[in-house]
Amino acid sequence: MIALVVGGAKSGKSMFAQNLSKSLNESLKNPISGQLDGEIEREVGKLYYVATMNPYDLEDLKRIENHLREREGYGFNTIEETLNMSKVSSLIKEEDTVLIDSITSLVTNYMFRGKEFYKDVSDDILSGILEIINNSKNVVIVSDYLFSDSIQYDCYTENFRKEIGVVNRKLAKIADTVVECSYGNIIYHKGKVI
């Protein structure tokens, strides 16, 4: 299962994605019936949280602290990786459930590496995420929705928005489910209600 969860800041998207990831992973614990010796348990994968934010200021650190508190008790194994999704892919197995939070942070990290500005980053990001998708049972991906205003931004910001848009569109195309979180409301754009 591939799910893309989008929304604005403080929309509830991360909490929704955490609950969805946990639910998908727990659904793998259902026993397989009809075996000779009764019921047997399926092999259950691990639940991973891929934290992609590279904190730049106090607000980022507070957001990270909040996310850590929110996911206490969920059973996530946290992987902190700000760029290399191929490295993440090498750590997971085909029965695992992976939550990637977030595309927005990945685009930021790729575009502003060191003192350079990298304009075209979507292919590199998608390549790493596709590796994770191909190596795991379930992937839930969080991304921001940054396209509802009508303000013209500088060329760097416009390019940033374009790259997020490219990644979001391509992920939405391959996702089984696409969900938008808005003011705590859940809107399904693709797939079934989970």
Segments predicted by a language model, with ranges:
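Portal/gating segments that form or line small-molecule/metal binding sites
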Residues: 69-92, 97-113, 119-123, 133
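Short, functional N-terminal and low-complexity linear motifs
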Residues: 12-17, 55-56, 97-100, 132-139
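Conserved P-loop
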Residues: 2-91
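Short secondary-structure boundary segments
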Residues: 53, 102, 143-145
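Generic beta-sheet signal
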Residues: 1-5, 47, 96-106, 139-141
